[in-house]
Amino acid sequence: MPAGTVCDVPTILLATDADWILEEVDASLADASTNVYRVRAGIDVLEAITQLNPDLVIIDEQIGNMGGIATCMAIRNAEGMDAIPITAVLMLLDRAHDVFQVQRCDADGYLVKPLDSLRIRKAADALLAGESYADPINLASGDAAGLAFQG
């Protein structure tokens, strides 16, 4: 059973200061079988992981005061020191060209904005199943295409 799961109810931690992202993620994932919690600052993510023990952390790349990439790196560093349990991380990117940053911070998957419920659910389901997820985009154009994630 994954770390934060109680009776197979996944816990998802969302790190964003944008209300519209909370609304999209909440509408896509929160239901009787999934709990979604939010922090507004990257600096609060490690403490929230300690308290909630989430199955998945979703991080907005442009979260204020500590960017999403730095937040993901802090998670991986804390995991490496056994300070927190290993947690799946999904990055929400502003541009397709930021995929290389996801690979550098060792995130498990990514989505490129604008978001939609189907892609959010598909990515979350993959990461909750222990898989990686790459948004099917073309780096040159930002349009949908097959792009393999090398995470």
Residue ranges and their predicted role:
Residues 131-151:
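CheY-like receiver
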Residues 15-16, 93:
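Conserved acidic carboxylate
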Residues 57, 110-111:
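Two-component signal transduction core modules
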Residues 40-56:
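Acidic, metal-coordinating helix/loop segments flanking the phosphotransfer/catalytic sites
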Residues 70, 91-109:
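Alpha4 helix (beta4-alpha4-beta5 surface) of REC/receiver domains from two-component response regulators
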Residues 55, 59-77:
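Conserved phosphotransfer microenvironments
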Residues 115-124:
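C-terminal output helix
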Residues 16-40:
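Two-component/phosphorelay signaling modules centered on CheY-like receiver
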